[in-house]
Amino acid sequence: MAVKSSTVDVRAALQSAGAHYMNLIEFGILKVFIDHQIFDHIPAEGSISVTDLATRTKAEVSLLQRFSDYLVASEVLASPAPHELAHTTRSLSYRSEEIAAGFVSHVYHFFLRPMATWTAYFEENGLREPKDAKTIPLGLATGHPEEDLYGVLDKEPRLAYMFNVAQARSAAIFPMKGLYDFAWLREALEDHIGAESPAIVDIGGSHGLALKELLAENPFIPSKRCAVLDFPQTVEQAQQNLDEDLRDIHFIGGSMLEPLPVALHAAGIYQFRRVLSDFVDKDIILALEQVRRVCAPYSRVLIIEELVKASRDKFAIAQDISVLNFGGKRRSEADWHQLASQAGLQVRHVFEQTETAFAVVELGLA
C-alpha cells in the first residue's frame, strides 16, 4: 500500500508541475509560429497540409509536424484530417497584425527572457526588488548589465519599437473619459495661465496618442499649447509618423530625470500617463522634483496608473511582477502619497474608475 500511495503522490506532484511545463512548451511554439508567420499562411477558412505549409514558410516538415501536433492537442489549431491543419478562433488571433501576437512577443522579450536570469540576478543582488535602474534583470538578459530600461532600448531598436507600440496601445486600453474633469483648466487658461505657458505637458507621452484622446474630449484646450516630452529618439520616431490631429503639438526631446526645458515651465498640467510605474522609487522622486521646480501655484501634476489594491486580480499581479524586470513596480495610493511628499508635492485628490484599478492621482505644490 505504501508503494502505491507513493506512486500516486509522485503522479500528483508531476501533474501539478507538468501543467507549468506544458504552458511553457505551448508558449514557446506560439512564439516560433508568430516569428515565422506560420499562422498567416494557414487559410482563414479550410485547411492546408503540413507539407504545403512547410514549403510556404521554408520550414522542415518533421519539425513543423511536431510543433503543430502540440498546438492541435492543446486546441489552438484544428486538424480536420491527418497531416492537415486549420485555424480555430484562438489561432486566428495569433496572425501577425493581431494584438495577441504582439502581446506574446512582448511577454517573451520583456518577461520570459529576463525571468530566465532571475537565479543569477538574485544570487548577485540578494532577494529584493531592484533599487537601482541600472541593475535590472532586463539588462542582464539582453547583454547590457549596466544599462537601465531606456539604455537597453537605445541599444536594442527592435525592443524599443515593441515597447513604444505597447505604450501607445495602452492609451486605448485605459481611456480617461469620465475619470477626470478638465473643466477647471478652461477657466485657468482664460484667467491666470500666461499665454506663453503650456496648457498640458505629457511627460513620456511617446507618439502623443493619449494627448490626442484628451484633446478630442476637451476641445477647449488649444493643441498648440500642448507638448510631449520624451526621449529624442522617441520624438524623432513620432514626428516621422505624426497623426494629422497632432500637427500643432510641440514634441520636445529630453528626459524627465533632467531639468525641464524653459518652454515647459509653469504649465497648467503635467501628466505622467502609465509612465512612472516603469521606474524605481528614487527616479520617480527625481522626476517629480524636476516638475515641482517648474510648477506655478496653479499647476497640477497628474499621475495616471493602476493602483495596487488588496482585491486586485491575478493578471494585475502578473503585470506588477513583469515590470520588476526593468525596475518598475505598481504602487498603492499610500505609496504615491509617500513618493509625492518626498518630492515636495502633495496628493490632493484621487479619482478612480469603479470597474478597474485605473486612477488619476492629482498632485499639487505642498
From Swiss-Prot:
Residues engaged in binding S-adenosyl-L-methionine: G204, G205, D230, S255, M256, R273, R274
Gene3D superfamilies associated with the record: Vaccinia Virus protein VP39 (3.40.50.150), Winged helix-like DNA-binding domain superfamily/Winged helix DNA-binding domain (1.10.10.10)
Entry EC no(s): 2.1.1.-
Keywords, in A-Z order: Methyltransferase, S-adenosyl-L-methionine, Transferase
GO annotation, biological process: methylation; secondary metabolite biosynthetic process
Phenotype of gene-disrupted mutants: Impairs the production of phomasetin but accumulates N-desmethylphomasetin.
Xref: InterPro entries: COMT-like, O_MeTrfase_dom, SAM-dependent_MTases_sf, WH-like_DNA-bd_sf, WH_DNA-bd_sf
Functional pathway: Secondary metabolite biosynthesis
Gene Ontology MF terms in the entry: O-methyltransferase activity
Record-stated family: Belongs to the class I-like SAM-binding methyltransferase superfamily. Cation-independent O-methyltransferase family.
Known function: Methyltransferase; part of the gene cluster that mediates the biosynthesis of the trans-fused decalin-containing tetramic acid phomasetin, the stereochemical opposite of the HIV-1 integrase inhibitor equisetin. The PKS module of phm1 together with the enoylreductase phm4 catalyze the formation of the polyketide unit which is then conjugated to L-serine by the condensation domain of the phm1 NRPS module. Activity of the Dieckmann cyclase domain (RED) of phm1 results in release of the Dieckmann product intermediate.
Protein name: Methyltransferase phm5
Organism encoding this protein: Pyrenochaetopsis sp
Taxonomic placement: Eukaryota, Fungi, Dikarya, Ascomycota, Pezizomycotina
Name of the gene this protein is made from: phm5
